[in-house]
């Protein structure tokens, strides 16, 4: 930020310097000041002209970005009208540094060298078609950031040519530029001429991001699945698919006063249990089921039956 303020002050001082020298030279040629300006000799006028040209050159160099942080302090030249008998100082004393002219000569050579380097940058042209609603400015939808710095009419062309440079030229020293020219035959076509590749941060490709596909849960429509299933019963007897219709019957008996024994009886007839269950013909005792395995009264019996079993006891 301080650098920008310093460059702005230096540029303003140079412009004021040149304007002041031009006014002094203009006043020396005015008829109303001919008597008081007779002391302005040819040497003084030449110095004033030199100051004007030097100030404009320095201002142009500053605008082109060829100044550095070590620019000399620029001081305004003394006013010859304020000191009639005194000749203005030499160019070295005017700029405040004996090596100022040498410094700007070196800067001018470096500027010429950088201009030659820019001409050696790669150059290519592309044609871009846009909608007519975009106007005369041309396409701006590329991936880079540009700043328009000029526009001029081209001889024999219907539309002007626009000039752009990278936004990060002064901060990252990126020399990429482009020219945009609308086609005379088809106004929707623009010829974009690029010069130089981007060396700034926006010219570095970003690492590719791997796309993670979300896991999708497939919901099965069981109603459609059930409707699409068919059962083929050809060649099968009806006896294989006969199922009991009545609900099962549970009977409970107390064994030796401890625990509960249950047996499941389906809807089949009593003949299915022949040889498996026999009743005790004693009239003084309750009927006890006799099964084909030996029952150990001392064995632990799991009584954790469902609640409806306990409620029915």
From Swiss-Prot:
Localisation per UniProt entry: Nucleus
MF GO annotations: DNA-binding transcription factor activity; sequence-specific DNA binding
Keyword set, alphabetical order: DNA-binding, Nucleus, Transcription, Transcription regulation
DNA-binding region(s), residue ranges: 135-203
Cysteine disulfide links: none
GO cellular component assignments: nucleus
Function: Transcription factor. Interacts specifically with the W box (5'-(T)TGAC[CT]-3'), a frequently occurring elicitor-responsive cis-acting element.
The family this protein is said to belong to: Belongs to the WRKY group III family.
Protein name: Probable WRKY transcription factor 41
Species this chain originates from: Arabidopsis thaliana
